[in-house]
Amino acid sequence: NTKIPIVYHDNPVTEYQKEQLINGSRAIANKKIKVISRSQTISSIRKRIIEESKQGHTLAFIDYVGLIGSNDKTKSLYEKTTAIVKELRQISLDYDCTIFLVAQINRNSENTKDKRPKISDLKETGELEQSATTVLMLHNENYYKGIEMKIEEIEIIIGKNRNGQTGILTLEYNQQNQRFDIKG
């Protein structure tokens, strides 16, 4: 964590801030990445994070919350998802782990004029909004216009940020290379 406010990520104002952002990016880039593609339960995720946290701070990317298995078949989808999100939040706190949890949004935003998703559009449970430290949502205006380009302009909407500001960060997305870059 660079501790640099998000407003300075696009245009750092000091050499120290630039250096911190570069060092933070390198630290993430040098992490070992392990992909687990089989279906997981909350218990297996917890076990894996405990193992990985022995090596230091862990980043866990979970795609997506609806695929996490549950042993309790009597719960509704809402109750199941709420319980999973609460458990992931507790794992994050207990093991100093950063968890990136992918969730779906409902289609309400597609019916609005600007089509940008809002936190209230998150599917299955309000617990996603409640438990999250940060909520990021992607928006591609060209998708709704039916325009395909090699380099797309993608907005990352920071809908919630307990430790900083909310707002929009615009990135360039190169579809061919599957790469995001800061615009400009």
What are these model-derived regions, one by one?
Residues N1-Q55, S70, L169-T170:
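Cytosolic-facing regulatory segments adjacent to core modules
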Residues I28-A29, Q130, I151, G164:
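A generic structural signal for short, non-catalytic loop/turn and secondary-structure boundary residues
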Residues V35-I156, Q176-R179:
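P-loop NTPase motor core
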Residues I154-I157, T166-I168:
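Low-complexity, intrinsically disordered Gly/Pro/Thr-rich segments
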Residues G159-N161:
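A generic structural motif
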Residues N163-G184:
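NTP-binding/hydrolysis catalytic cores, primarily Walker-type P-loop NTPases
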